[in-house]
């Protein structure tokens, strides 16, 4: 994540293509593809936009994103989503700073994760009612 970021980003999806940079050990997906033949986009069942709408933590911006970048985070997210049948989340956090202490970040993450769990509960309730 960009070290100048000033918000926590909740990522809705992982993408299969566009991986151009190598990781710190030199690994780069062949042809820039995470999973040959895989779907272009995989979505989390957690409605991150709704979670963002409901989360409020003192002076911490929480933002919705559909682009985790084409690097290790997005690659890992894309591959993890089917393992939990979509019950996965990627939270990009900014570095600790004068405006974001470890304590405040911890508080924000607790609130965000609680909202995500509530959102998953809604999805499960809707699927059993159908």
Swiss-Prot record:
Please name the GO terms that the record assigns under molecular function. cysteine-type peptidase activity
Pfam families listed in its UniProt record: Peptidase_C15 (PF01470)
Q: What is its EC number?
A: 3.4.19.-
Looking at its record, which EC class is this enzyme? hydrolase
Instruction: Output one GO BP term.
Output: proteolysis
Enumerate the UniProt keywords alphabetically.
Hydrolase, Protease, Thiol protease
Question: Quick check: keyword Disulfide bond in the entry?
Answer: no
Is Protease set as a keyword in this record?
Answer: yes
Catalytic center residues: 11, 73, 92
InterPro entries registered for this protein in UniProt: Peptidase_C15-like (IPR016125), Peptidase_C15-like_sf (IPR036440)
The family assignment reads: Belongs to the peptidase C15 family.
Q: Please identify the protein, giving its name as recorded.
A: Pyroglutamyl-peptidase 1-like protein
């Amino acid at each position: 994540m960009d070290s100048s970021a000033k918000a926590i980003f909740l990522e809705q999806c992982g993408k299969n293509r566009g991986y151009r940079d190598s990781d710190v050990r030199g690994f780069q997906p062949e042809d820039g593809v995470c999973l040959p033949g895989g779907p272009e986009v995989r979505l989390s069942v957690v409605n991150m936009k709704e979670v963002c709408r409901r989360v409020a933590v003192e002076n911490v911006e929480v933002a919705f994103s559909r682009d985790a970048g084409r690097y290790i985070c997005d690659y890992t997210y894309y591959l993890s989503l089917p393992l939990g049948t979509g019950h996965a989340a990627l939270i990009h956090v900014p570095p600790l700073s004068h405006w974001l202490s470890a304590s405040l970040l911890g508080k924000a993450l607790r609130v965000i994760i609680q909202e995500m769990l509530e959102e998953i509960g809604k999805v499960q309730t809707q699927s059993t009612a159908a």
